[in-house]
Amino acid sequence: MAGAKEIRSKIASIKSTQKITSAMEKVAVSKMRKAQMRMAASRPYAERIRQVIGHLANANPEYRHPFMIERPVKRAGYIVVSSDRGLCGGLNTNLFKALVKDMNVNREQGVEIDLCVIGSKGATFFRIFGGNVVAAISHLGEEPSINDLIGSVKVMLDAYLDGRIDRLSVVSNKFVNTMTQTPTVEQLVPLVATPDQELKHHWDYLYEPDAKELLDGLMVRYVESQVYQAVVENNAAEQAARMIAMKNATDNAGDLISELQLIYNKARQAAITQEISEIVGGAAAV
């Protein structure tokens, strides 16, 4: 029965692991719902700023903010939003693949790369992969604050205003639904015009202190809000991916327990059969 004892020990060990993964799945579900609420709450703010920027830009065509001016790209910047923890399937791996692919396209065109990394997984990746990381921040927690991001974002915006980079993009995972998280690379500056930016009303507004100063402030706030939106959405995607990964681990543990239980029963049956055969053989000899 030595084999049966070993199998019984394995079953107990897997059951213990199954309890842990099941608990982690439930925790991820709770955190995902909270992250979804933060994600939904942050969207209207960024959308409204975008609308006001569009109105200001169209109403004051004589002033072009630097964030709205296209220029030849010699150096590009990326703000990379990754997670601080693992056990979330291929979430970070898929994100890094999409980023590296985009970086390679730029490098083939002679464009150099600067990186701002959010999340410890991104920092670890670029320590191994290599890359010019000019700013980094990690351990933002489950409820990130936009104030925690301002310093790192400012480093990249100052680089753009000083002409050290000519384009800035944010790389993060989009939360499509519980089962789908899509890695995306979105251009932040120069600001890309969108169809919904067209004015539906041509009303005149009075701006205080003036339209130029207001636009200057709003452009920075808009970029900060977009990065914050990327962080909270990536957090929701992380929790969804972790929930799915832990569910799969729990299900796989259940399948493995069933297989081992069957092997254990067969081993036990074989041992009993062997003992009966020995008893019968001994009785026949007598």
Swiss-Prot record:
Cellular component GO terms, alphabetical: plasma membrane; proton-transporting ATP synthase complex
InterPro entries in UniProt: ATP_synth_F1_ATPase_gsu, ATP_synth_F1_gsu, ATP_synth_F1_gsu_CS
Cell compartment(s), UniProt: Cell inner membrane
Disulfide linkage: none
SUPFAM superfamilies the UniProt entry points to: ATP synthase (F1-ATPase), gamma subunit
One Pfam family hit: ATP-synt
Source species, domain of life: Bacteria
Keywords recorded for this protein, A-Z: ATP synthesis, Cell inner membrane, Cell membrane, CF(1), Hydrogen ion transport, Ion transport, Membrane, Transport
Tagged with keyword Lyase: no
A GO BP annotation: proton motive force-driven plasma membrane ATP synthesis
UniProt-listed CDD domains: F1-ATPase_gamma
GO molecular function (one): proton-transporting ATP synthase activity, rotational mechanism
Topology term for the membrane: Peripheral membrane protein
Family, per entry: Belongs to the ATPase gamma chain family.
Protein function: Produces ATP from ADP in the presence of a proton gradient across the membrane. The gamma chain is believed to be important in regulating ATPase activity and the flow of protons through the CF(0) complex.
PANTHER family assigned: ATP SYNTHASE GAMMA CHAIN (PTHR11693), ATP SYNTHASE SUBUNIT GAMMA, MITOCHONDRIAL (PTHR11693:SF22)
Quaternary organization: F-type ATPases have 2 components, CF(1) - the catalytic core - and CF(0) - the membrane proton channel. CF(1) has five subunits: alpha(3), beta(3), gamma(1), delta(1), epsilon(1). CF(0) has three main subunits: a, b and c.
Protein's UniProt name: ATP synthase gamma chain
